Amino acid sequence: MKLPNNIAEISLDKEVQVGVYPPNGFLHFYEASLGNGDYFGLYWEFGKEDKEPIVCEMIHDEGIIKPSFSSLDKFLEWYKLNNFDYGDEEIEDEKLVYNYLEKGNQCLRQNNVNKAIEFYKMSTESFGELSENWFKLASQYKRIGNELDFQKSIINSVISNWAIEFPSQNVIRSLKNCTPVKELENHPLLKNRKNLDLNFGGQKENENYEVIKDIFTELYEIGDTNKAMLLEQNYALMMYWETSSFQERNNFNINDWRSKFAQKTKSRITLNKL
């Protein structure tokens, strides 16, 4: 994993998380920590280990991490502005994923669909594991009749990072209702779309888990490794929040899973020399 040039300016944990929560690729640092499990960390997307990370905030009570700064430089700018504390003063962060999303939303309010698509695409390029930006992009592709890119975006909206944001019911509905285009008719997610509702918890049996397992297994087989690892982590995250009896019935042990996933992601979570 590529470390930022100014890495010496933060007090860094030396071990990258394996998952489930915090997710794989999250590296905790101590500046601006609020305690009680709320702190910041560097985060590398799956497939972007050779790029500098963004900065995410771990929000313990919600069980998520949230993209907060587009780079460590931007975090440090904010941190210094707030007298080296967690303060209320804000900075401009043009490359943050939410900034592009908001610009896209503004364009939609002005009925400028093509410009909105540009900003939504920029948001996915800025950070590609957020369900919302892919769904915003998908919706506009649908609006202009671009079915191929609509379906590609829906796939990315579902196989996003659920430790950051869980796909909305609108995403699931769009997935289930689509008729796959020829180029995507054999995609593992689209082939299994009718069997997924992504409802978890409070059930004695839940077929979603077996379907998801089938999907990420096939993604591994066809060489889409980054999406496979992301979806496998999502599977484990949902299973992690289930009751212990549910886990036992489904032969899931978080420690066993972490051990195996650590091996799968070993090359990914190896840091460049500090």
Regions found by a protein language model. Name each.
Residues 1-47, 107, 114, 125-134, ...:
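A surface-exposed partner-binding patch
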Residues 33-36, 48-49, 60-64, 80, ...:
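Short, solvent-exposed loop/turn segments at secondary-structure junctions
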Residues 51-88:
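Compact, glycine/acidic-enriched structural inserts
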Residues 54-57, 100, 111:
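A structural "flexibility-hinge" signal
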Residues 86, 93-94, 127:
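Inter-repeat boundary and helix-capping residues of tandem alpha-helical solenoids
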Residues 94-108, 135:
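Alpha-helical tetratricopeptide repeat
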Residues 111-114, 118-119:
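Low-complexity, intrinsically disordered
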